[in-house]
Amino acid sequence: FYGCKSLLSLPDISKWNTNNVPNMEYLFCNCESLLSLPDISKWNTNNITNIEYLFCNCESLSSLPDISKWNTKNITNMAGLFYGCKSLLSLPDISKWNTNNVINMSGLFNNCESLKSLPDISKWITNNVKYMEYLFNACTSLSSLSDISKWNTNNVKTIKYLFNDCKSL
């Protein structure tokens, strides 16, 4: 669906067999007019390693399906996952996502300018993360953040603009 700028809705793709899908990057990216997504909460994500820019620039979405129970243990790249989701008012509770293998988190919440808070991501394991730049960049309405002081950043190579333009923090 990449780049379907005028698409307002999607057919029911909730029963798609995603058992063998390793890569979902850019799947809904640049669907700027998309108002809602079908329930994709039950997709089998066991084999997925890349969700980079999955919802990128879905500018009209104000909410997402409950993806809190997605199995994220094999994901190495979640860069820009919610990048440019300017109308998102909240996120599903992704606090229990397994981030043990994630290497790239850059721009994960970048430009989510309507989000006032995030789920508690303080317990995310960041031991393997190398890229965190722009993680919360331009989250202009973000007024609270869980305590991420215990995140292990020993392997991080780039962390620039982490909280750039977070005017409400």
Locations of the language-model features?
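Negatively charged
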Residues: 1-169
